[in-house]
């Protein structure tokens, strides 16, 4: 017997049937959300960056200047990803879906070989994300946030009830700090995501 780190698991030769479980274990536990692409070079080993920006030619040029070796820790929305060149698309393996984008998709629509992270705000979206093959979901808002003060928070009890009904990793998003990770995991979160303090 020997214990392996999550990073080492990807280098081992597992049967094909085990690949889904291995992929689930390779998600980081913290997702930073920002418009600042420079954060990418300062991420912790157990962190990814969701670059939440609108699709513009300037953003595509900015991404083209980013070192290719850093792109594997980057998450971009499906709309932006579809406008990238082939090398960028092959390197950025995690694609974000807004809930509106998610609900327009059906089983078989997702590109194979990529990880999809779905933004969900209710149970029906969460279940749909799992059914069409998304590998993880952001469920929000867990707590009240400064960025969306008028959006009612789910609260931890409702978050847990929803997260328990799917088998994909669910990240808690909304009003959280890095120190909330351990509590979030006790509430059936795989990890946490956030703009300011994650």
What spans do the regions from the language model cover?
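Short acidic, glycine/proline-enriched helix-loop-strand junctions
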Residues: 113-114, 165-169
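Glycine-rich phosphate-binding active-site loops on the catalytic face of alpha/beta enzymes
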Residues: 95-105, 136-150, 175-198
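Charged helix-capping and loop-helix junction motifs
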Residues: 151-159
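NUDIX/MutT-family hydrolases
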Residues: 1-24
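Catalytic beta/alpha-barrel core
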Residues: 12-13, 31-41, 45-128, 138-140
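A short, charged/proline- and glycine-enriched loop
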Residues: 25-29
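Nucleic acid-binding interface residues in structured DNA/RNA-binding domains
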Residues: 155, 174-175
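Structural motif
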Residues: 44-46, 90, 132, 165, ...
């Amino acid at each position: 017997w020997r214990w392996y780190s999550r990073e080492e698991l990807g280098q081992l030769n597992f049967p094909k049937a085990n690949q889904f479980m291995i992929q689930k274990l390779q998600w980081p536990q913290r997702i930073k959300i920002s418009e600042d692409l420079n954060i990418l070079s300062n991420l912790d080993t157990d962190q990814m960056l969701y670059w939440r920006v609108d699709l513009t030619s300037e953003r595509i040029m900015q991404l083209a200047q980013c070192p290719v070796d850093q792109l594997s820790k980057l998450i971009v929305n499906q709309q932006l990803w579809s406008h990238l060149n082939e090398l960028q698309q092959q390197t950025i393996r995690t694609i974000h879906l807004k809930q509106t984008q998610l609900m327009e998709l059906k089983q078989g629509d997702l590109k194979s070989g990529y990880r999809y992270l779905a933004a969900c705000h209710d149970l029906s979206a969460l279940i749909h994300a799992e059914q069409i093959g998304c590998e993880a979901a952001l469920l929000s808002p867990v707590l009240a946030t400064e960025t969306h003060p008028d959006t009612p928070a789910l609260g931890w009890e409702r978050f847990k009830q929803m997260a328990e009904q799917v088998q994909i990793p669910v990240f808690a998003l909304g009003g959280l700090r890095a120190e909330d990770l351990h509590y979030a995991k006790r509430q059936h979160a795989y990890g946490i995501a956030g703009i300011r303090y994650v």
